[in-house]
Amino acid sequence: GRDLVKEQILVAAGEPLSFSQKAMEIEGHALECRINAEDPVTFVPSPGTIRHFHQPGGPGVRVDTFAHEGCDISPYYDSMIAKVMTHGRSRPEAIGRMRRCLEMMVVEGIRTNIPLHLRILDHPDFVAGRLDTGFMERFLAPRATGGA
């Protein structure tokens, strides 16, 4: 792989990238879901103590977290408790791995946005990769008006 941090520092210093765009090859697809301690509908923080915690794993899966059973989640700091990342040979494979991971992940004692991520993974535009900066606003609009 490439050292992206090194490349970002080079660009910030006004230097060119150490490789050309033509030298880049796409090798699969990756996704990341940020798991937050918040209500999946209202986005209100959900502080408390994690009573039970299980993180997923397996090929093409990475989880970065500080969370564990007995961990106290404060209302005074960032609500992110984990990042779940998946990689697959294709977008459908990466999405399938992410779905499996989110379904396997257990966080009891607080609410999380895992149900929201699962709904996003099912959305036809997300599945097809038809995304833009307005996706979430459109995705959440039916809830704001009392719909789906």
Stretches found by the model and what they are:
Residues 1-148:
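ATP-dependent carboxylate activation and anion-phosphoryl transfer catalytic cores
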